């Protein structure tokens, strides 16, 4: 073969699982996690992961394939009673495959005991890289039938590479999509071009081998079907310009004069074990193979004590459906977090990923056999100036008055906790951003490469262009990027000044006035306290504006208002029917916001086992009992994202697209909490 299987394996590791390395090193923050006692919210240590894996193997045999070993949700009451210096109650949640079935079990780390194992008949756990996808790719790319299909297109062995995708719940005429563990692979032409010589192209997704796909059974280690077809015969060209985008492959513009940020006197944040303190903010940070970075016990440390805002903040699911009914495209709708894992696909942060003054943290993940892996520099923490003052006022009344300080402004500084996941062709930054005025942002930045479809048309003047672009945009000759959506669902366990909270809609409404009133255009705000889970389902409507607020049921500010936090997010919802075969598995996208009564086991908006899952899992099940949500512990489930209509400027790598959730104090403080910043 032109490229050895070692090269193929490297490509797959980088493309799908960020190139794990079983080593330490890298720039480390001033945290000695090993020396600090573990809190209830710290990530599992390597020793804890190993202990959990060993216990499961002792019960189920050594043929276990571990999909996720992570910190189990602690009992909330017990966790909140924990004090530094005490022994925390810690458990591991373990999802694994054994004997062709999906298992889930809780392992108690303090007692070295396993709870009864739960077997799932609907839905499967995340795919593993080293245990499933990498060996599957190596096998498939040597298969004689596949090599024959490539040879028909004059593609030499090693110049084509087929990469794995999840299948959803399709192909029931060929397999059992409920119980079989499946992959669908689509193929790309990776022969090197230009200055990179014999190495494969770094633009691996730029040249699809359209009309060729493979259905593969992971546990039988067998190809189910090779589909080799294209409408109207023939195939789009694959040996086209890859538009290599790495430095050295294209002419770059003249460099800018340096624009730098520095920390000559050190950082203003401290990291103690998993706890981070900065400018009155305090939170615990951990890393999960599925969710990536997770925050716990988020709040403000004040002279009067700790004031909570949220008990936990984490992604709960991603959903990226493509909209093309072609035989090689109809199944493409990815639950990127639940199928691949935001943490498992996190890549090492380097280059321009973080500012030069950032501090980095390693994390511990695990292989498919349960072996812990120390992977470097998956988290960075840094401060930055957002470029505008946090507040400012110029009092023009006193212009020119001697001795009057009539201009006041204060520089803003923000704290950012960052990770980046590369899930196949897309790269996702997940930032938690803390401000000095009490605001906190959950920011998701999408960049990378769109899924590329090969077509006959080289320009919109070609006869096939209209049909070729029916479901997307011609972004380069013979390449269409297909229309799709990005939905990012989060779970935010709101604890505003304690666990007893209410969900309120502050509705802005026009108020009719008497005909003889001096004004006819008046609006006012009325507050609705929502009483049940079903009533709390929120679909935003620009014609009916409302502030969405989580308010304490017990605490008020100096003026007597319930202390609260407002949640702000963009309005994005599906354009298609939710009876669609992919969307009925992602019903969390039906609403911009759901609110549920807290339950320890309700963590994922599309269900615990989302790969090849059944319709209606997750949030629709959580709210089916329509529990009351007044004066109690409630959880917010916001969804953000965007409809992606591709354009030429997205090629070859898409500019960063920012979406965010804002948590903003509303009567939580008695004044602007940033008013005391020095000039």
Where are these regions (language model features)?
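Exposed beta-strand-loop-beta-strand "reactive/processing" segments of non-cytosolic proteins
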Residues: 61-111, 157-217, 279-281, 417
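Extended effector regions of multi-domain proteins
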Residues: 109-129, 191-293, 297-439, 445, ...
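Bacterial Sec-dependent signal peptides at the C-terminal "C-region" and cleavage site
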Residues: 12-35
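Hydrophobic helical h-region of N-terminal Sec-dependent signal peptides
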Residues: 6-12
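Charged, low-complexity surface segments at secondary-structure and domain boundaries
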Residues: 33-42, 117-128, 140
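N-terminal pre-domain segments of enzymes
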Residues: 28-57, 234-254
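Positively charged n-region of N-terminal signal peptides that target proteins for export
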Residues: 1-4
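Short, non-transmembrane alpha-helical segments in secretory-pathway proteins
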Residues: 40-80, 128-172
């Amino acid at each position: 073969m032109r490229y050895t299987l070692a090269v193929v394996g490297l490509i797959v590791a980088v493309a799908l699982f960020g190139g794990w390395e079983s080593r330490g090193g890298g720039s480390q923050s001033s945290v000695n996690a090993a020396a600090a006692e573990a809190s209830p919210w710290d990530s599992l240590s390597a020793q804890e992961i190993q202990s959990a894996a060993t216990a499961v193997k002792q019960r189920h045999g050594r043929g276990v394939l571990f999909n996720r070993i992570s910190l189990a949700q602690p009992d909330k009451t017990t966790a909140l009673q924990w004090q530094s210096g005490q022994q925390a109650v810690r458990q591991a949640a373990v999802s694994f495959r054994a004997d062709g079935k999906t298992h889930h079990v809780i392992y108690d780390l303090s007692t070295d005991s396993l709870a009864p194992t739960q077997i799932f008949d609907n839905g499967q756990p995340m795919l593993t890289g080293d245990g499933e996808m990498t060996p599957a790719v190596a096998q498939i790319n040597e298969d004689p039938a596949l090599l024959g299909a490539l040879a028909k297109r004059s593609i030499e062995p090693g110049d084509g590479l087929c990469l794995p995708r999840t299948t959803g719940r399709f192909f029931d005429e060929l397999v059992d999509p409920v119980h079989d563990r499946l992959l669908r692979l689509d193929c790309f032409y990776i022969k090197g071009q230009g200055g990179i010589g014999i190495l494969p192209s770094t633009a691996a997704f730029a040249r699809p081998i359209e009309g060729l796909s493979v259905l593969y059974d992971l546990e039988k280690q067998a190809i189910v079907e090779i589909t080799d077809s294209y409408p109207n015969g023939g195939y789009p060209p694959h040996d086209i310009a890859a538009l290599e985008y790495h430095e050295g492959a294209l002419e770059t513009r003249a460099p800018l004069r340096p624009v730098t940020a520095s920390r000559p006197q050190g950082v203003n944040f401290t990291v103690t074990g998993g706890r981070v303190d900065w400018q009155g903010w305090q939170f615990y940070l951990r890393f999960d193979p599925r969710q990536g970075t997770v925050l716990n016990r988020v709040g403000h440390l004040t002279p009067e004590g700790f004031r909570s805002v949220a008990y936990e903040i984490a992604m709960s699911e991603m959903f990226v459906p493509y909209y093309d009914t072609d035989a090689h495209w109809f199944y493409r709708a990815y639950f990127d977090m639940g199928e691949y894992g935001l943490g498992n696909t996190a890549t090492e942060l380097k280059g321009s990923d973080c500012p030069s003054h950032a501090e980095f943290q390693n994390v511990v993940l695990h292989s498919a056999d349960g072996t812990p892996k120390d992977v470097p520099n998956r988290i960075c923490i840094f401060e930055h100036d957002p470029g505008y003052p946090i507040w400012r006022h110029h009092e023009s009344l006193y212009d020119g008055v001697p001795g009057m300080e009539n201009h006041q402004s204060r520089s803003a500084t923000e704290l950012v906790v960052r990770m980046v996941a590369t899930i196949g062709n897309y790269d996702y930054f997940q930032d938690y951003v803390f401000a000095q005025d009490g605001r906190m942002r959950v920011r998701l930045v999408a960049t990378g490469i769109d899924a590329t479809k090969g077509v006959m048309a080289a320009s919109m003047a070609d006869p096939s262009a209209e049909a070729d672009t029916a479901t997307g945009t011609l972004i380069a000759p013979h390449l269409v990027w297909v229309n799709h959506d990005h939905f990012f669902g989060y779970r935010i366990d709101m604890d505003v000044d304690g666990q007893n909270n209410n969900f309120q809609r502050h509705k802005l409404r026009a108020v009719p006035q008497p005909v003889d009133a001096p004004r006819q255009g008046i609006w006012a705000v009325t507050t609705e306290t929502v009483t049940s889970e079903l009533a709390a389902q929120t679909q935003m409507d620009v014609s009916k504006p409302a502030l969405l607020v989580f308010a304490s049921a017990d605490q008020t500010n100096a003026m007597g208002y319930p202390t609260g936090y407002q949640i702000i997010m963009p309005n994005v919802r599906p354009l298609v029917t939710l009876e669609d075969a992919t969307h009925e598995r992602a019903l969390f996208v039906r609403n911009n916001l759901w609110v549920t009564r807290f339950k320890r086991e309700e963590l994922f908006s599309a269900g615990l086992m989302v790969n090849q899952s059944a319709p209606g899992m997750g949030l629709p099940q959580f709210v089916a009992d329509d529990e009351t949500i007044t004066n109690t512990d409630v959880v917010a489930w916001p969804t953000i994202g965007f409809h992606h209509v591709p354009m030429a400027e997205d090629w070859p790598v898409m500019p960063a697209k920012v979406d965010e959730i804002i948590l903003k104090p509303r009567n939580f403080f008695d004044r602007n909490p940033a008013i005391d910043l020095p000039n």
